[in-house]
């Protein structure tokens, strides 16, 4: 389950960065 949480955090960070840059 920790792996899922870590992956979700990475995806969220990437999404936020992309959204902000876009």
UniProtKB/Swiss-Prot annotation:
Pfam families: Leader_Thr (PF08254). GO terms for biological process: threonine biosynthetic process; transcriptional attenuation by ribosome. Keywords: Amino-acid biosynthesis, Leader peptide, Threonine biosynthesis. Residues 1-22 are annotated as: Disordered. Residues 7-22 have a biased composition (Low complexity). InterPro entries: Thr_lead_pept. Belongs to the thr operon leader peptide family. This protein is involved in control of the biosynthesis of threonine. This is thr operon leader peptide. It comes from Serratia marcescens. The gene is thrL.
């Amino acid at each position: 389950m920790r792996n899922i949480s870590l992956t979700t955090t990475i995806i969220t960070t990437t999404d936020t960065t992309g959204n902000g840059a876009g």
